[in-house]
Curated annotation (Swiss-Prot):
Listed name of the protein: Deoxyuridine 5'-triphosphate nucleotidohydrolase
InterPro entries for this protein: dUTPase, dUTPase-like, dUTPase-like_sf, dUTPase_trimeric
GO molecular function: dUTP diphosphatase activity; magnesium ion binding
Reaction(s) catalysed by this chain's protein: dUTP + H2O = dUMP + diphosphate + H(+)
Gene that this sequence comes from: dut
Organism: Stutzerimonas stutzeri (strain A1501) (Pseudomonas stutzeri)
Similarity comment text for this entry: Belongs to the dUTPase family.
Length: 151
């Protein structure tokens, strides 16, 4: 398991609410919580930037973190991430913030301490462009946007 440097910015985190943790031994993401000052209503179509009370520094340039939505919030309530996926670079050291967007038809209350997203560490492979005049041919070629499927 990798070590991840973290600073608690909201004293309720770790005291009143658990620190981010894996829900099961097979979980890929650590749950992030809404460290709001009070319960907040997210109206249909509204986007809100929500603090997690936690700053991290991954430090290892071969790793990054993704902030991903929680499937139940999106499927049952229409609450998804405003930026769809958040990318946290290894050299970022600020507070993790979650952009929540209510794409549903009903207002939704985000409770203080509610699990609103998940953080997943992923490997990073950096590349440099190698400029060429042409590519070796492939079965797919330049086909895209549904080219390989039936719909």
């Amino acid at each position: 398991m990798h070590a991840l440097q973290a600073k608690i910015l909201d004293p309720r985190l770790g005291r009143d609410f658990p620190l981010p943790e894996y829900a099961t031994p097979g979980s890929a993401g650590l749950d992030l919580r809404a460290m709001l000052q009070q319960d907040t209503v997210l109206e249909p179509g509204q986007t809100l930037l929500i603090p997690t009370g936690l700053a991290i520094h991954i430090a290892d340039p071969t790793l990054a973190a993704l902030v991903l939505p929680r499937s139940g919030l999106g499927h049952k309530h229409g609450i998804v991430l405003g930026n769809l996926v958040g990318l946290i670079d290894s050299d970022y050291q600020g507070e993790l913030m979650v952009s929540c967007w209510n794409r549903g038809q009903s207002a939704f209350t985000i409770a203080v301490g509610e699990r609103i997203a998940q953080l997943m560490l992923v490997p990073v492979v950096q590349a440099r462009f190698e400029l060429v005049d042409s590519f070796d041919s492939s079965d797919r070629g330049a086909g895209g946007f549904g080219h390989s499927g039936s719909h």
